[in-house]
Amino acid sequence: MQKLIILLLVAAVLMSTQALFQEKRPMKKIDFLSKGKTDAEKQQKRSCSDDWQYCESPTDCCSWDCDVVCSG
């Protein structure tokens, strides 16, 4: 009976450590992907034509002026 309890405890520890490692892996991927260019650097490469372009934030516009559509 004691051997069974020890075996179950070891299995529980192994499963919990595996779960911890799996939680940390996506965070590393996110950190790797987020170390890209800044918004300003990304905008320099795309064509800056804000004519009637829908936006959600100022970073979506070349003019950095967003009010449902880019203006400026």
Swiss-Prot record:
It comes from Conus textile. Brominated at one of the Trp residues. Disulfide bonds join 48-62, 55-66, 61-70. The lineage of its organism: Eukaryota, Metazoa, Spiralia, Lophotrochozoa, Mollusca. The modification 4-hydroxyproline is found at residue 58. This is Conotoxin Gla(2)-TxVI/A. The presence of a 'disulfide through disulfide knot' structurally defines this protein as a knottin. It is found in: Secreted. Its main location: secreted. Keywords: Amidation, Bromination, Cleavage on pair of basic residues, Disulfide bond, Gamma-carboxyglutamic acid, Hydroxylation, Knottin, Neurotoxin, Secreted, Signal, Toxin.
